[in-house]
Amino acid sequence: MLDLKFIRSNPEKVQEGLNKRNKDISIAPILELDEKRRKLLAEVEKMKAIQNQKSKEIPKLKKEGKDTTELMNELKELSDKIKELDSQVKEVEDEIEKILLTIPNIPHESVPIGKDDTENVEVRRWGEPRVPDFEIKPHWEIGEKLGILDFERASKVSGSRFTFYRGLGARLERALINFMLDLHIEKHGYVELFPPFLVARKSMIGTGQLPKFEEDAFKTTDDYFLIPTAEVPVTNYHREEILKEEDLPIKYVAYSACFRAEAGAAGKDTRGLIRQHQFNKVELVKFAKPEDSYDELEKLTADAEDVLKHLGLPYRVVLLCSGDLGFSSAKTYDIEVWMPSYGRYVEISSCSNFESFQARRANIRFRRKDGKLDFVHTLNGSGLAVGRTVAAILENFQQKDGSVVVPEVLRKYMGTDIIK
């Protein structure tokens, strides 16, 4: 959520920032409501001053033995008017908050201006894609042939965009989760959380999924939501708390299943593991001081990249342009892994700095050493999406005979060096 005071003081700057997103977003309604609210508050203060003045007259009149009935009636009328105005103020404030919750974050000044993903900027590459002397099979095909992925039975059980992992496929998924957690905990210094997979509406609002993206979420009949990412419960872990400056940055890593309706994704990557309704992910979440958050974004992105380096998977890092930026993000790097059967790089992680956008919604602050309270900056990134990593391994390490070589760092988890 954007700061109303900042919007009021910098309307042109805010509108200019929102215009960079290439969407029709106007702050005019908020400014109008804010002006209405301030006028109502001024009227309330004026009436309260009159009320206080008249209240002081009552003891004097009583002391003089005079009738206070008329004055008491005036005070009753004033009290009723103040209550009515307070009610109007509450209505206007609720309307302001309702609109604020639908307005996205302002892109950071370092974000390139562009209309969509075609104008994202490649930052760097790592690793060289293999050029095999045989035709690469797509991961779903080789997975089914090896008997480690079963899409057909998953479709029978649950419908489209679900998968059964079987045998060494299930072990590979589990090995990746454990490897990613161990790497981030032991090498990168994150603290592990194992979060609930169901959250309340307030938590989804806190991280920016609601109200704007409710159609993309799976919701229970009693208003709980299946999490689309561990970002939601882990960020809300410190909701409505005041943290200590000396404890920042706080770094969490969490494995969770993720659930997404993928509304509007028809026809996109419909086969295989790339776009599923349910998938596993290891998430990195940070709480940082505002002055440190962009350094922390670079470190977080490097931590996610490190997983791919250890696995030996070629990838590139892309800086998202303003038109492709997520709703809550001020700046995002996408990490894209090379997928041979696609002939292109495919997103496997998004690493974002939300600045104070989520912290304002979730009321997460910290106390500076001088006693001043400030909102933290929140960051997160996939470290990594597990199903997509499985897909990348099956495609990048498949052999001519149809087997798949297990990356060296996974062999102690897998108990084998090859899937055949």
Curated annotation (Swiss-Prot):
Spell out the coiled coil positions from the record.
Answer: none
Per UniProt, L-serine binds at: T229, A230, E231, E283, S382
Q: Where are the transmembrane segments?
A: none
Q: Which CDD domains match?
A: SerRS_core (cd00770)
Q: Which UniProt keywords apply?
A: Aminoacyl-tRNA synthetase, ATP-binding, Cytoplasm, Ligase, Nucleotide-binding, Protein biosynthesis
| Pathway membership, UniProt | Aminoacyl-tRNA biosynthesis; selenocysteinyl-tRNA(Sec) biosynthesis; L-seryl-tRNA(Sec) from L-serine and tRNA(Sec): step 1/1
What Gene Ontology cellular component terms go with this record? Answer: cytoplasm
The source organism is Caldicellulosiruptor saccharolyticus (strain ATCC 43494 / DSM 8903 / Tp8T 6331)
The record's section on NCBIfam families has:
serS
- Record note on domains: Consists of two distinct domains, a catalytic core and a N-terminal extension that is involved in tRNA binding.
Q: What is this protein called?
A: Serine--tRNA ligase
Q: What is its EC number?
A: 6.1.1.11
Gene symbol here is serS
Q: Which protein family is it in?
A: Belongs to the class-II aminoacyl-tRNA synthetase family. Type-1 seryl-tRNA synthetase subfamily.
- Which HAMAP family does the protein's record reference? Ser_tRNA_synth_type1 (MF_00176)
Per its record, the protein catalyses: tRNA(Ser) + L-serine + ATP = L-seryl-tRNA(Ser) + AMP + diphosphate + H(+); tRNA(Sec) + L-serine + ATP = L-seryl-tRNA(Sec) + AMP + diphosphate + H(+)
This molecule's function is given as: Catalyzes the attachment of serine to tRNA(Ser). Is also able to aminoacylate tRNA(Sec) with serine, to form the misacylated tRNA L-seryl-tRNA(Sec), which will be further converted into selenocysteinyl-tRNA(Sec).
